[in-house]
Amino acid sequence: NAIGYFHQRIFQYIAGCKVPENGNDGGWDIIYTNKNGIKLPDETVIHKIYVEMKNKHNTMNSAATGKTMIKMQNQLINDDDCACFLVEVIAQKSQNINWGVTVDKKKISHKLIRRVSIDKFYSLITGDDYAFYKICNMLPKIIKEIIDNQEKQIIPNDTVIKELKEMTRNLKINIEDLAIQTAIFMLGFGNYKGFEKNLG
């Protein structure tokens, strides 16, 4: 959760991004505005993106998925110069695609409702294909603090640190903290821009 919170809050320091307080501005996690226009992959140009952010691609059940889709459809009805993104920190792959879901047994989608991996979102809002990779390279100190604090706490059924340490045994890096950081990146971001050439 700390890493997810970090990923959401850091956007307040990126030009054009607003991170509303909980429940404000329609409950969106991030609102990105660019008066010069934002070009989507299909060449559509809009000026605002409303973002629902999820830490991992498989964290929404069908009810939450349907609710999110309806929220996005309602936003498009109220603002025809926007797009709505489901941004996933750990997506199945690097992507910026139309998001289609089944609601009430009907498959629905809209070209302005998109499922986007975080690397593609950073690229879109910064103009730098490697922006997410660069930010992640600044994270070692934060990750070390999280790991140090995690090991001091007793949390039932939490096997993430144990699994990461097991992954590091397969890496040929002697420094455990660096190996854990690399394992985290491999686990979640192996096919994102910048990571694929450095971790593959």
Spans of model-derived segments:
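Acidic-basic catalytic patches of nuclease active cores, encompassing PD-(D/E)XK
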Residues: 1-23
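Conserved catalytic cores of phosphodiester-cleaving nucleases, focusing on short active-site segments
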Residues: 15, 30-37, 41-58
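Basic, glycine-/proline-tolerant helical and adjacent loop/strand elements
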Residues: 23-28, 64
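Short, well-ordered loop/turn elements at secondary-structure boundaries
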Residues: 26, 45-46, 79-81
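Catalytic cores of nucleic-acid endonucleases
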Residues: 55-123
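Non-catalytic C-terminal interaction segments of nucleic acid-processing enzymes
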Residues: 119-200
